[in-house]
Design a protein with these regions (language model features):
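Short alpha-helical donor nucleotide-sugar binding micro-motif in glycosyltransferases
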Residues: 68, 130, 241-246, 337
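Nucleotide-sugar donor phosphate/pyrophosphate-binding loop at the beta->alpha transition
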Residues: 98-100, 109-128
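Donor nucleotide-sugar binding/catalytic pocket of nucleotide-sugar-dependent glycosyltransferases
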Residues: 124-172
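Conserved donor-binding/catalytic core segment of Leloir-type glycosyltransferases
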Residues: 176-210
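Nucleotide-activated donor-binding/catalytic signature segment of Leloir-type glycosyltransferases, i.e.
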Residues: 219-238
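Aromatic "clamp/platform" in nucleotide-sugar-dependent glycosyltransferases that forms part
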Residues: 254
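Short hydrophobic beta-strand element within catalytic cores of glycosyltransferases
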Residues: 271-274, 281, 285
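A charged, aromatic-enriched C-terminal amphipathic alpha-helix characteristic of glycosyltransferases
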Residues: 311-349
Length: 359
């Protein structure tokens, strides 16, 4: 297939969306597909309001059209609901080219956290964006069911994986963490209000808390929590070494659709502590023994009392965590992605996709 992928999230951004797309593009190319990326790198950009680390393409409509016309894709995957995503969507509808979308991020919830408005205020925009796609790709069945309840029933599963060549036990400890007195509790991800970091940083546990990542709240949290080690963003082997240097991975977010860092941490032999909410529940299962209690040993602790979850996770077997984390492979995830796009290419559009949009 000739596959175009339009995304507002791409390097140098550091997040699960970018890592998921990068691994998928690599896998698709290895399978012989022709892949064209449309990313903010191709446009003039401006900082996202309130989040200068993320840059949004300025007026990408015409550049997106030119790129898609030149590439002539069989099918388009639109990964994000930003300016590039909307531009690619408009091109597909105008040309009659089938497209899929992805629901990576709970933008209504994030917007609610940042604005104080109800998340329901933002859902009509999400429904409009996704309604005409041939399929909405989601990381978990639970998320698909949630979208169906909101009037978007045409979802397909696109799970996530880990790069097993990178994320595995046995890496040498990261010097910045190895020098700390243990136990070490680690968070990896954006340092932003929607990640609920104070819930972790305020926990009264003995040991040292380490935060890996960048974001708009970094300076404020560094000042507010002087005893916490903030290491900034880490990549590649340095990130894997950070996982291997800790005793517990703490994931305080209540709004993630999945949590790629959770399975990376597990694959490195790091038990997980989190809230029993979508994302962690979909990875760890209600009992912390994996999806459908597939593991004989517990690999994570889910509890509304995050302090209790951390203390329980500290007692878990790192080897069991590593075995379970390694079960998440990109090969299977890319099979699902590829199947969804093939089905989109050959399927008849849904009734909502055939309905003309009002200007």
């Amino acid at each position: 297939m000739r596959i175009a992928i339009a995304t507002d999230a791409w390097h140098p951004q550091v997040n699960g969306v970018v890592r998921s797309l990068a691994m998928t593009v690599t896998q698709l190319a290895e399978r012989g597909h022709a892949v064209e990326l449309i990313t903010p790198e191709q446009f003039r950009t401006v900082p996202m309001p309130g989040y200068k680390e993320i840059r949004l393409a300025m007026v990408p409509r015409f550049g997106t059209r030119r790129s898609l016309d030149a590439f002539a894709p069989d099918v388009v995957h639109i990964a994000t609901e930003g300016p590039i995503g909307w531009s690619a969507r408009g091109w597909c509808l105008a040309r009659g080219i089938p497209f899929t979308t992805a629901f990576h991020t709970r933008f209504p919830d994030y917007a609610a956290v940042r604005t104080g408005l109800s998340a329901e205020r933002f859902w009509p925009v999400m429904r409009r964006f996704h309604a005409k796609s041939r399929a909405i790709l989601v990381a978990t069945p639970a998320l698909g069911a949630e979208l169906a309840e909101r009037g978007l029933p045409h979802w397909r599963l696109w799970s996530r994986g880990v790069d097993r060549s990178l994320f595995h036990p046995g890496h040498a400890p990261l010097p910045e963490i190895a020098a700390l007195p243990g136990p070490v509790y680690l968070y990896v991800g954006r340092v932003a209000v929607e990640k609920n970091l104070p819930a972790f940083l305020d926990t009264p546990v003995c040991g040292v808390k380490v935060v890996v990542g960048d974001g708009p709240d970094l300076a404020e949290l560094r000042e507010r929590y002087p005893d916490v080690r903030f290491l900034g963003a880490l990549h590649g082997e340095a990130l894997a070494r950070a996982y291997c240097s800790a005793n517990v991975f703490v994931f305080p977010s209540r709004t993630d659709t999945f949590g790629l860092v959770v399975i990376e941490a597990l694959a490195c032999g790091l038990p997980v502590a989190a809230y029993p909410v979508p994302g962690p529940l979909d990875i760890l299962g209600a009992n912390g023994r994996g999806i459908g209690d597939c593991m004989p040993a517990t690999v994570g602790a889910l509890d509304e009392d995050l302090t209790r979850a951390i203390r329980r996770a500290k007692q878990l077997d790192p080897l069991a965590a590593a075995v379970y984390g390694a079960s998440f492979g990109w090969e299977c995830a890319t099979d699902q992605f590829e199947t969804a796009l093939r089905q989109a290419l050959h399927a008849e559009p849904s009734a909502s996709a055939r309905t003309p949009e009002l200007a």
